Amino acid sequence: MRIDVIDTLPDFARLEENWNAVYDADPDAQLFMSWKWLSGWLGQISSPWFVLGAKASEKADAPYVAFLPMRIQTKLENARFHNELNMAGNFSADYTGVLCAPGAEHQVIPAFARHLKRMNWARLNLENIRMSEPRIRLLLAHFPKAGFQTSEINRIGKVDNIDNNLCPFAALPPDWNAYLNMLSSNTRQKIRRLLRLVDETGEYRITVATPETIERDLNTLLRFWEIKWTPRKGDLVHTLIRSNRAMLTRSFRADLLFLPTLWKEDRPLAALATLIDRRKHAFLFYMTGRDETFDGPPPGVILHSHSIRHAIANGFTEYDFLRGNEPYKYSFGVKERRIRYVMVSTKNGLNLGGKIDQRTIPDVLTESTELHQKGRLVEAEHGYRQVMDVEPKNADAIHRLPPV
């Protein structure tokens, strides 16, 4: 098994046809592992990233049979820098994983694990992993207790008790009425009544984002979302809004976003962002925002019902509510899938190989310089020396290192 490292956008662009072929064949594949979504996301993130590509042959023109996209972070702990490997889709993707042609797992996953163990990292964060259990077991088997600590991360919210490792989804039949018949009689009647409000010309209407309205509609969505979540998330909200705006804008340009807005006359009431996977025929509900001061028909139920009806009419077979087992999702005829967050750490908390990853030298230099400027000289010196352990002649580290 040959493993290549792809770490530039031009090289990633050249993978499109091969990637799509593996994606279409892989039953575990989902939108956040698609070439189209990742090509936008990788161009957005600031930390170093790479994709491991596996070939079953040493021939240069042999096709890849599997891909593992990852990103590298730099952390400071106990006056030393270490690296952490994250799935490339973090922290925007609700699902991550390994893309693999069926039948190749038993060769590919061990080869990926061996490659990872030759890298420099202290923690491997397998966050939001949506993979079959055999694939997960095969991967984790290569990080035994003798050399690594493995822990499962619980994702149940302390405030709302929502389990963010549970992901409800509705399997969609080919006919809208057949879908309604899957629901309780009360829900069925409620949805029909609410959709009549927007189907019949009147005070309520739904618009769907176009190139001319996407900025306005995203502003509506994110403004409502910010108002709701600022009390709980604090200043983090601003970072999340910037990231979500960039990701959703790129997704819209790539024809991956369905964004309906509910209006009462000229007043926007709510907007709902859903990602579209045309290859796997799935709608993935990503986020919503609504006017919390509106006291009337439930905007969320209206927009979800409208979106599900639209999905069925266009031949989609799944409506995925993504992470979180919020009670309202269960009125839409859903099943559940469980994702996992497994953390693999080195025993001593230091990078494998004792050195930082070369790709993170710019990050370590930047952070060490900031520490230096703040008067935290011991930590800064450690950072400069860690850079020189990898690049002994690094001019920036040599210049900034205090004289002995």
Spell out what each predicted region is.
Residues 3-85, 128-295, 399:
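A conserved beta-strand-loop-helix scaffold within acyl/acetyltransferase catalytic domains
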Residues 73-159, 280-336:
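Acyl-donor binding region in acyl/amide transferases
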Residues 140-177, 318-366, 370-371, 403:
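Active-site/acyl-donor-binding loops of N-acyltransferases
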Residues 238-239, 298, 358-359:
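Short helix-capping and inter-helix turn/linker motifs at the boundaries of alpha-helical repeat units
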Residues 385-404:
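Short, charge-rich amphipathic alpha-helical segments embedded
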